[in-house]
Amino acid sequence: MNMAKQIYYRRRRKEHARQKCNDLLRAMMGEDLVAQWWTGPNHAFDMQTPETVFDKDHERVYAYIMTSVHGEW
């Protein structure tokens, strides 16, 4: 696979992960709090915002949300 396709598919996976994260967050806390969650410091990410961590490692944020969905706060 050429480099352009790899970049395209990587970007699509990240966009898909963001959508899944938002869907799960809306189900857990409601639409009004989702934006606040993304931009507020979070202990799970050493007080970095989930937005900052997602930009570097979207799988880490998705995994954290999935553990929360299953009640592992």
Stretch-by-stretch model annotation:
Residues 1-73:
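Non-transmembrane "mature" sequence context
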